[in-house]
UniProtKB/Swiss-Prot annotation:
Cofactor binding summary note: Binds 2 Mn(2+) ions per subunit in a binuclear metal center.
List of residues binding Mn(2+) 2: 40, 78, 113, 194
Function: Hydrolyzes the pyrophosphate bond of UDP-2,3-diacylglucosamine to yield 2,3-diacylglucosamine 1-phosphate (lipid X) and UMP by catalyzing the attack of water at the alpha-P atom. Involved in the biosynthesis of lipid A, a phosphorylated glycolipid that anchors the lipopolysaccharide to the outer membrane of the cell.
Organism: Stutzerimonas stutzeri (strain A1501) (Pseudomonas stutzeri)
UniProt protein name: UDP-2,3-diacylglucosamine hydrolase
Any one biological process term the GO annotation gives: lipid A biosynthetic process
């Protein structure tokens, strides 16, 4: 059995989500072969050199799960794309490229965070290209901590404002893009997060049935996708 989650947006200001996640790690996740976290694990991440005691505690909890033999994979999201190898070492997890094709219960599956699929949001896509540029990342990682914190607050506030102002379809995945993405990677299943719109979308690629599974975000409730010999099953659960 394999579990996939995304968009927890962990932060000290949401202890209810943190408690639910720690409970998830100590119970359901212990039964899994692997746990995949597909981005926006943290609400903000300004660098491994700026880890807070809160973030350190999350790393320890993940490491405890890895010591039980559960493989943990972490993918960058748009909020935490500066997570590096120092955190992954402390957490006992492996950083997973976006996109990645992995084997889930014998089937090749494409995993993505999902923000790169929202191509109608042209302003965000320009910002994404700028921030993910290797030179930009080098500069960001070498800014003083105070500057990084200020910049992170500014970007987060602007993101929230823009999300409220933009039309719903603009900040969602561009559906016409999906068949081509699946065909390019030679898979029939795509799993991603980012949009906070949990659902399974059936489609057709080269005359064959395919599907796009969107992971739910942890806010009013938690979400996890379970993959096993019976297929794919995603369901919400209470945070408390």
């Amino acid at each position: 059995m394999i579990l996939l989650i995304s968009d927890l947006h962990l932060e000290e200001e949401r202890p209810d989500i943190t408690r639910a996640f720690l409970h998830f790690l100590a119970t359901r996740a212990t039964q899994a072969e692997a746990l995949y976290i597909l981005g926006d694990f943290f609400e903000v991440w300004i660098g491994d050199d700026a880890m807070t005691p809160f973030q350190e505690s999350i790393a320890r909890a993940l490491h405890a799960l890895s010591e039980r033999g559960v493989r943990i994979y972490l993918m960058h999201g748009n909020r935490d794309f500066m997570i590096g190898q120092t955190f992954c070492h402390k957490a006992g997890c492996k950083l997973l490229a976006d996109p990645s094709v992995v084997q889930l219960c014998g089937e090749p599956v494409l995993l993505m965070h999902g923000d790169s699929l929202c191509t109608r949001d042209e302003g965000y896509m320009r910002l994404r290209r700028l921030l993910r540029n290797p030179l930009s990342l080098f500069v960001l990682r070498n800014l003083p901590l105070a500057t990084r914190r200020k910049l992170a607050r500014k970007l987060r506030n602007e993101s929230r404002t823009q999300t409220r102002m933009k039309a719903s379809d603009i900040i969602d995945v561009t559906p016409e893009l999906i068949p081509g993405v699946l065909a390019e990677h030679r898979v029939r299943t795509l799993i991603h997060g980012h949009t906070h719109r949990p659902a399974t979308h059936d489609l057709e690629v080269d005359g064959q049935p395919a599907k796009r599974i969107v992971l739910g975000d942890w806010d009013r409730q938690g979400w996890a996708l379970q993959v096993d010999e019976n297929g794919y099953h995603q369901a919400p659960f209470a945070l408390s």
